[in-house]
């Protein structure tokens, strides 16, 4: 789910913290990607005939096609992707997962009704609501990435939290995900639409966390409280408090505790046994991968093993897979050039008063570390 309405709130209150970029601007960057979010996007994608991609025995293979071609697109643009897979969900997420189960059950009823009435638009809509990323989907994608020579990490808990930890450690440049809670976990840079379909022609949205805090006038702890008020995966929210009121209250009172002391709780009741403190602590001190124990390496693809897996087992076209392997090999030759800014050290910093700061300048030091050869170990 992420954080309700956070992207719009940032666009309204801190537009200077968002940059639109072309994918080619990330040449030489190491980027941590929320794998589950990607796989979900690939699974709900439908072809022009309205059907998902399947093998002859009816097994869905949309996730493999998406992972293969989107990863190649990133490699061709000089990006060094590392996929981060979710571990066990935190206990605080159990209520949210229960709600999702209820919504899925309701979607099943609505789907059956739409099928009975022959309403194709509703059939498509409710079918997507039933999509769930399974262990098999994850295992398929991990095998594919290994054969492609692309590293992945298994997070101990939430993938976005481990992505953010890698960014904060200066190990990668950014977190790529569609969920905005990567910012709540403190990633310095968050990228949206990096793995979107090329056909959609969506520019990459680049959010800068420190600039967001500066422009909306909050500390990182206050930003977490704001996100809890907006609505997150780990607890409920105060009734009747929308985004505009939430940011006004945080600016005025500074914390959820002070807000509860000063609002009319008869009009704006908080949830019973509200676990906002636990949610805050989860954002502040999440269970994350130990970046000192991982060593990321990008290797040559194993072409024959890819043919065996993707063609013999999953029935993809051999010509297309071999062509993809050629593109990967070619991209490896080009990526050795590296980023120009990795050869220079930077002194001083840009003034915070600048209206439109150049993203490359304002993040150069972090980008420099993100572009250096890895000190990671591939998570297995």
Swiss-Prot record:
PROSITE patterns: XPG_1, XPG_2. InterPro entries: 5-3_exonuclease, 5-3_exonuclease_C_sf, Flap_endonuc, HhH2, PIN-like_dom_sf, XPG-I_dom, XPG/Rad2, XPG_CS. Residues 122-253 are annotated as: I-domain. Residues 1-104 are annotated as: N-domain. Binds 2 magnesium ions per subunit. They probably participate in the reaction catalyzed by the enzyme. May bind an additional third magnesium ion after substrate binding. One of its GO terms (molecular function) is RNA-DNA hybrid ribonuclease activity. Mg(2+) 1 binds at residues 34, 86, 158, 160. DNA binds at residues 47, 70, 158, 231, 233. It holds the Pfam family XPG_I. Residues 332-351 have a biased composition (Polar residues). Its cofactor is Mg(2+). Residues 327-380 are annotated as: Disordered. Gene3D superfamilies: 5' to 3' exonuclease, C-terminal subdomain, 5'-nuclease. Its EC number is 3.1.-.-. Signal peptide: none annotated. Its main location: nucleus. Residues 336-344 are annotated as: Interaction with PCNA. Keywords: DNA damage, DNA repair, DNA replication, Endonuclease, Exonuclease, Hydrolase, Magnesium, Metal-binding, Mitochondrion, Nuclease, Nucleus, Phosphoprotein. It is found in: Nucleus, Nucleolus; Nucleus, Nucleoplasm; Mitochondrion. Mg(2+) 2 binds at residues 179, 181, 233. GO terms for biological process: base-excision repair; DNA replication, removal of RNA primer; retina development in camera-type eye. Structure-specific nuclease with 5'-flap endonuclease and 5'-3' exonuclease activities involved in DNA replication and repair. During DNA replication, cleaves the 5'-overhanging flap structure that is generated by displacement synthesis when DNA polymerase encounters the 5'-end of a downstream Okazaki fragment. It enters the flap from the 5'-end and then tracks to cleave the flap base, leaving a nick for ligation. Also involved in the long patch base excision repair (LP-BER) pathway, by cleaving within the apurinic/apyrimidinic (AP) site-terminated flap. Belongs to the XPG/RAD2 endonuclease family. FEN1 subfamily. Interacts with PCNA. Three molecules of fen1 bind to one PCNA trimer with each molecule binding to one PCNA monomer. PCNA stimulates the nuclease activity without altering cleavage specificity. This is Flap endonuclease 1. The gene is fen1.
């Amino acid at each position: 789910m992420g954080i309700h309405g956070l992207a719009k709130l940032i666009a309204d209150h801190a537009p200077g913290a968002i940059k639109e970029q072309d994918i080619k601007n990330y040449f030489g960057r190491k980027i941590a990607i929320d794998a589950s979010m990607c796989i979900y996007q690939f699974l709900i994608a439908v072809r022009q005939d309205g059907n998902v991609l399947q093998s002859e025995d009816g097994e869905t293979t949309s996730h493999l096609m998406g992972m293969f071609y989107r990863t190649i697109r990133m490699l061709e643009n000089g990006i060094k992707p590392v996929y981060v897979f979710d571990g066990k969900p935190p206990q605080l997420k159990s209520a949210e997962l229960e709600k999702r189960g209820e919504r899925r059950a309701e979607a099943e009823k609505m789907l059956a009704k739409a099928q009975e009435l022959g309403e194709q638009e509703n059939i498509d809509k409710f079918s997507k609501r039933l999509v769930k990323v399974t262990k098999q989907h994850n295992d398929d994608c991990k095998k594919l990435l290994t054969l492609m020579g692309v590293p992945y990490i298994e997070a101990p808990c939430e993938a976005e939290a481990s992505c953010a930890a890698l960014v904060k450690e200066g190990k990668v440049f950014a977190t790529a995900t569609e969920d905005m809670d990567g910012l709540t976990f403190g990633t310095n840079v968050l990228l949206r639409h990096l793995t979107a379909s090329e056909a959609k022609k969506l520019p990459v949205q680049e959010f800068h966390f420190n600039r967001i805090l500066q422009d909306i006038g909050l500390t990182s702890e206050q930003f977490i409280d704001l996100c809890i008020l907006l609505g997150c995966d780990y607890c409920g929210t105060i009734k009747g408090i929308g985004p505009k009121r939430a940011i006004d209250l945080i600016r005025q009172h500074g914390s959820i505790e002070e807000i509860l002391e000063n609002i009319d709780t008869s009009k704006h009741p908080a949830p019973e046994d509200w676990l906002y403190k636990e949610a805050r602590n989860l954002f502040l001190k999440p269970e994350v991968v130990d970046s000192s124990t991982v060593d990321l390496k990008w290797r040559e693809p194993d072409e024959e093993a890819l043919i065996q897996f993707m063609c013999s087992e999953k029935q993809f076209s051999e010509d297309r897979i071999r062509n993809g392997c050629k593109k990967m090999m070619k991209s490896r030759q080009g990526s050795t050039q590296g980023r120009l800014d990795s050869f220079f050290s930077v002194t001083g910093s840009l003034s915070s008063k600048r209206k439109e700061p150049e993203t490359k300048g304002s993040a150069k030091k972090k980008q420099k570390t993100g572009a250096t050869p890895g000190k990671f170990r591939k998570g297995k």
